Amino acid sequence: MKTSTEALEAHRPSAVLNTLRRLGFGTVVSVPDSWLGEILIRIDQEPGMTLVRATHEEEALAIACGSRLGGVRTALLVQNAGVLSMGAGMVSLAQRYQFPLLMLVSYRGTPDDPVFYHVPKGRATEPVFRGIGLAHTCTDRYRPIGPQVEHAATYAEEASCPFALLMGREDIQW
């Protein structure tokens, strides 16, 4: 029989939310994506968190940087295609001014998500991230997700830079 902690960790999106709560994230900025729908509803219901819904990714990045500048621990929840479209803002704002932002990124267009219109974005994601110097890693589905989120958040803080954690459907979709 599983303990309640093991059950939460078994449901990876619950573990992500629990980790954000435990680490004291006060603001989450997002551009909606079908995988993110339910976790965003749950974040919006969290007493200690504010969910800000942006209309596009560069706006989300600017809001997240402003929130962080105001001293609030902030996370971005966006799709990988959204990060691709915020390239200039990422380089000239978030990286230039060393904002420690945790970016939880739904990784669309992978072999596990072979929707034809996502595949080109999936192929481009990691090469573009490397090209603009965006620190990132992919989650490991065989390891608990909570510590992976915590490690990514710690890296962003310690390195004073944005860090993108690329997440599969099982990590983020409720």
Q: What kind of feature is each model-predicted range?
A:
Residues 1-174:
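Thiamine diphosphate
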